[in-house]
């Protein structure tokens, strides 16, 4: 039996040293502090809305937003600190849009607010090249499309179906770009979570759309089915090529959930029988998945 390598070099590769822990805690606490500050501002307005005059409502948000931008622009702080501060300022933009809409009762739909928020965020995302800010931008863009779908598009129409699947392909395109950047070395290893989160969002969203289409008789099934087959095939091929356990595990599991949804929605069995056979499908499929992967 071979002995495990317990040399200092091996331990150094596995465990973080004191300097790395200090750096992690500094960044983590800074991000949490900025997040709680922005959340505190939002709850402050929610609690004191009736007591604050219009000037104070708009003035507080604008002063904080301008101060954040000035600190990012004219200070010599660490680049990461500036990026986190600018990400916090991005949420202040959304707060400003919401406050303005509530004060003057503009009558705008929710997707209008998120559309304006998205447009004002894209320049900062491009300029800073900061993964959390890019994630915020992609999330805002997808939320805008979904809100438009819910409020404007007709239920189960081609417009709703195509726009919903457009969200899937936005996440897929972002995944492809970040995977390519990671392969070419243009993406920091510390941002690998960003790639995994985008790919997870792509898989979950296309699976969700397909399961919804399966459960609703009047829904258009062809578009989400084609998207799911194409994306699952491409990601399985890529996962096999680069030996990525993430893709090889999550896609078969998503396919298992789609199969289970199809069985439940199309079967005429009683609840107890559905529960029993559904459990058999999940246990059998999960066991086979673990056996194949390991």
Q: Which residues does each PLM region occupy?
A:
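Alpha-helical multi-pass membrane segments and their bilayer interfacial helix-loop junctions
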Residues: 1-294
């Amino acid at each position: 039996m071979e002995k495990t390598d317990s040399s200092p070099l091996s331990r150094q590769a596995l465990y973080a040293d004191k300097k790395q822990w200090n750096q992690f805690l500094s960044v983590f606490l800074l991000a949490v502090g900025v997040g709680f500050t922005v959340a505190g501002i939002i709850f402050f307005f929610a609690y004191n809305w009736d007591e604050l005059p219009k000037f104070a409502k708009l003035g507080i948000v604008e002063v904080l937003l301008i101060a954040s931008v000035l600190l990012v622009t004219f200070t010599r702080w660490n680049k990461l600190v500036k990026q986190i501060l600018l990400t916090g300022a991005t949420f202040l933009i959304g707060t400003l849009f919401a406050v303005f809409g509530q004060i003057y009762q503009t009558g705008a739909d929710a997707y209008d607010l998120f559309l304006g928020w998205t447009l004002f965020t894209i320049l900062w995302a491009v300029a800073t090249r900061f993964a959390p800010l890019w994630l915020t931008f992609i999330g805002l863009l997808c939320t805008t499309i979904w809100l438009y779908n819910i409020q404007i598009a007709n239920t189960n129409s081609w417009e709703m179906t195509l726009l919903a699947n457009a969200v899937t392909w936005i996440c897929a395109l972002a995944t492809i770009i970040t995977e390519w950047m990671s392969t070419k070395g243009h993406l920091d290893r510390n941002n690998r979570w960003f790639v995994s989160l985008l790919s997870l969002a792509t898989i979950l969203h296309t699976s969700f759309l397909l399961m919804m289409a399966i459960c609703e008789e009047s829904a258009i099934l062809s578009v989400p089915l084609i998207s799911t087959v194409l994306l699952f095939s491409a990601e399985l091929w890529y996962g096999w090529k680069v030996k990525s356990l993430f893709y090889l595990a999550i896609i078969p599991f998503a396919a298992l959930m789609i199969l289970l949804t199809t069985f439940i929605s199309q079967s005429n069995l009683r609840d107890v029988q559905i529960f029993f056979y559904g459990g058999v499908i999940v246990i059998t499929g999960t066991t086979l998945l673990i056996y194949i992967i390991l």
